[in-house]
């Protein structure tokens, strides 16, 4: 590569080459050279959240008369450009880098410095952009900002959409009775609406967990600087920064109750990952129910038909598979894997600092994004338009001997068990067998064993 495509930069460790068109400086370049590990870069949403923090901090330092209006305005303008999605190609660093995320913090400082120095003379990445800050409080804060914004603006709306889709579908189907199943075996009947109400409740419970956690998640480590003591930061910096960010985003960010905890641990991230795990498990349950209900069309349950979205086999013509529930199950598996990684990473808080912050940032961001998309996909491409196969459902329901459970109070458990076995063995309806083995006539049995009535607690 031609020398003309590089420029020479210098830092405390000496000189090195930096691409001529790069907005970053020597510390970022050293990280680029040192951490050629993977193709996993710091998430875009995290970079934008970090820029939002720098924007708030520049304004706060100006309010506190620590930065000149000109420098603060230049820094804030550059940071806002990044927050709005510009210059993202200037953040090339691998997530597998220094565990504090110092490389990414300096990447941001250097890019903002470069952009700002075109507006005013000499905006220094450390002295001005990083004023009153340490990577040790900035990166944990950026993780919380990123997570909070994603939960509020993406995940919760997606979950609400999924819940509404479930509720609307249940309402449109109505009280169609079907075989209940426990242990994947025939059980007493339930209605579609009852079965789907469990799905809706799972999503609702998961939403409530996220909403409760937001109070903790919006506490920021900023202001604690290197070890939590706040050295080199104005005591009012964190509060003033949060005021600016809250006005812009509508969030409720505030300084952490304990800055030592906020820097040395990643408890809030671990709690968030636990919420992600709960939602992932719920989505797996719903998806697997849909897959089983859709199974067949001839050799399975065949209770519903999911929308046919694409050919299902490269060798079997006409085969159509439940691709959306399968996709969602894979999302859930990825989220569960991310949760385990986050758990291990959260254990790496030694004394005053956790040193796996970039990994936590990446996995949290990925999980939140995947879950948001999965909720939308499941709602719009599976639940919204599946069809109920009433003939199949009614046929299976009519031949379900477990309905004899409703006779327990009249004929006793032992007689009921004999009726069930006989009906199974002879492949006859429960009403036919019960009318032979009891004193109850067919009309009485039909009333007692009415599947619709059996779905109601009467």
Residue ranges and their predicted role:
Residues 1-458:
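Conserved, well-structured ligand/cofactor-binding cores
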């Amino acid at each position: 590569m031609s020398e003309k495509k590089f420029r020479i930069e210098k830092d405390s460790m000496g000189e090195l080459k930096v691409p001529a068109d790069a907005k970053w400086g020597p510390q970022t370049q050293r990280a680029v050279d040192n951490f050629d590990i993977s193709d996993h870069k710091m998430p875009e949403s995290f970079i934008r959240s970090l820029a939002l923090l720098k924007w708030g901090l520049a304004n706060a330092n100006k309010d506190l008369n620590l930065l000149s209006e000109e420098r603060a305005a230049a820094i804030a303008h550059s940071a806002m450009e990044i927050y709005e999605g510009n210059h993202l190609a200037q953040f090339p660093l691998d997530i597998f880098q220094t565990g504090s995320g110092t490389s990414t913090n300096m990447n941001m400082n250097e890019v903002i410095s470069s952009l700002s120095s075109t507006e005013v003379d000499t905006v220094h990445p450390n002295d001005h952009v990083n004023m009153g800050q340490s990577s040790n409080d900035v990166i944990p804060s950026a993780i919380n900002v990123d997570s909070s914004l994603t939960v509020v603006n993406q995940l919760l709306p997606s979950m609400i959409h999924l819940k509404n889709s479930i509720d609307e579908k249940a309402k449109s189907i109505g009280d169609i009775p079907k075989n209940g199943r426990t242990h994947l075996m025939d059980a007493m009947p339930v209605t579609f609406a009852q079965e789907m109400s469990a799905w809706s409740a799972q999503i609702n419970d998961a939403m409530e967990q996220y909403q409760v956690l937001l109070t903790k998640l919006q506490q920021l480590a900023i202001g604690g600087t290197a070890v939590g003591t706040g050295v080199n930061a104005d005591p009012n910096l964190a509060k003033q920064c949060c005021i600016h960010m809250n006005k812009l985003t509508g969030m409720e960010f505030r300084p952490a109750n304990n800055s030592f905890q906020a820097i040395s641990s990643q408890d809030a991230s671990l709690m968030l990952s636990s919420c992600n795990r709960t939602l992932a498990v719920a989505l797996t349950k719903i998806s697997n129910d849909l897959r089983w209900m859709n199974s067949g069309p001839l050799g399975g349950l065949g209770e519903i038909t999911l929308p046919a979205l694409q050919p299902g086999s490269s060798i079997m013509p006409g085969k159509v598979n439940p691709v959306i529930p399968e996709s969602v199950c894979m999302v859930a598996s990825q989220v569960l894997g991310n949760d385990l990684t986050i758990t291990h990473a959260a254990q790496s808080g030694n004394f005053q600092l956790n040193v796996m912050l970039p990994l936590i940032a990446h996995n949290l961001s990925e999980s939140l994004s995947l879950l948001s998309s999965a909720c939308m996909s499941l709602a719009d491409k599976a639940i919204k338009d599946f069809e109920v196969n009433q003939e199949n459902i009614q046929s299976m329901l009519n031949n379900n001997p477990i309905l004899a459970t409703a006779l327990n109070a009249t004929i006793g458990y032992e007689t009921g068990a004999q009726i069930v076995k006989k009906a199974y063995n002879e492949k006859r309806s429960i009403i036919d067998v019960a009318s032979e083995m009891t004193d109850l006539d067919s009309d009485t049995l039909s009333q007692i064993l009415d599947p619709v009535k059996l779905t109601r607690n009467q």
